[in-house]
């Protein structure tokens, strides 16, 4: 293992062993953020996780590899999408590039002048011998890093073999809510703005090119893209760039069209590397990452982590909730 990869793994591995790692990509002491602080470093691999995607098999092209053992496949859906991204005979890289070339604007793209970036995620993450679960709403003032977080946690689930189920997202509404106010500098984006519009440069920021020959490199790139999308707002151009980063991941495969556990449909892409299987669900119109999960094999197999990215946009103040 190279010294550079050893450094990356030193940053990320402890996140799996803390009971609070899963949940709060903000300033919670055990959460993960995207600056050189300890919380920042841990998010890079804490936001991918279990069975958020379903129905990945019926529309999968025949030439693709078999579906991963991680998700429970229960339902298949056909998604209205850009014809270029789902045309016959395309490689996974060509599909992602075609989608990047045709991503559409979202309502949030028209509100970037508002002072607060708003994100809501639900996450499932491996701790030492359990899965932690949390619903996070975060408002971050872009000019100074102040803001607010509201977190709801469900009881930890013993063991590592849990796969998020359709009834779980609604359970968060019954959980007690904790509100944390952050002063200036308390919250950080995953990467500093403005993000580069060049995919190779963005990829190097997410996973150093020095690691390109390491078995973990595809996994690190995928984790980085999901962490980026989970913790800061990506506008139309930035979404296109992030899709081009995914398109360049070695060995990425296309699994067809599927739905996540809250019923949203998208295009499913899989990365198998370094003893893990990751799946990303991508909106076929906006290019937004809707959900992601990662499943580990090896000595302690099971769920690594999972994320549903439910709401994103911009608000005039904290506490304002946006609906998808």
Identify what each model region corresponds to.
Residues 1-19, 34-60, 246:
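Secretory targeting and sorting signals
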Residues 21-23, 30-36, 40-41, 51, ...:
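A general, composition-driven signal for non-globular sequence regions
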Residues 56-324:
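Intrinsically disordered, low-complexity prosegments and terminal tails associated
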């Amino acid at each position: 293992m190279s010294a550079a990869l050893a450094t990356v793994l030193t940053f990320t591995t402890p996140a799996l062993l803390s009971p609070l790692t899963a949940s709060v990509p903000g300033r919670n002491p055990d959460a993960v953020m995207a600056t050189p602080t300890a919380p920042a470093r841990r998010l890079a691999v804490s936001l991918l996780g279990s069975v958020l995607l379903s129905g990945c098999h019926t529309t999968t092209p025949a030439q693709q590899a078999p579906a991963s053992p991680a998700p429970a496949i229960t339902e298949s859906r056909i998604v209205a999408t850009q014809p270029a991204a789902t045309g016959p005979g395309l490689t996974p890289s060509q599909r992602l590039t075609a989608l990047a070339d045709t991503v559409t604007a979202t309502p949030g793209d028209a509100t970037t002048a508002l002072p607060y970036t708003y994100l809501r995620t639900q996450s499932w993450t491996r701790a030492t011998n359990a899965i932690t679960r949390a619903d996070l709403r975060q408002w971050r003032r872009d000019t100074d890093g102040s803001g607010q977080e509201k977190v709801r946690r469900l009881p930890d689930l013993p063991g590592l073999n849990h796969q998020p189920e359709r009834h779980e997202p609604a359970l968060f509404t019954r959980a007690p809510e904790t509100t944390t106010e952050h002063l200036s500098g308390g919250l950080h984006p995953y990467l500093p703005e403005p993000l580069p519009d060049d995919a190779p440069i963005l990829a190097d920021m997410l996973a150093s090119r020095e690691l390109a020959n390491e078995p973990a490199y595809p996994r690190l790139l995928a984790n980085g893209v999901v962490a980026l999308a989970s913790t800061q707002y990506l506008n139309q151009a930035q979404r296109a760039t992030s899709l081009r980063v995914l398109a360049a991941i070695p060995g990425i495969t296309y699994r067809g069209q599927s739905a996540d556990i809250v019923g949203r449909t998208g295009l499913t892409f899989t990365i198998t590397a370094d003893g893990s299987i990751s799946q990303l669900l991508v909106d076929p119109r906006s290019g937004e990452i809707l959900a992601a999960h990662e499943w580990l094999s090896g000595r302690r197999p099971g769920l690594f982590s999972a994320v549903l990215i439910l709401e994103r946009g911009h608000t005039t103040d904290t506490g304002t909730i946006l609906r998808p």
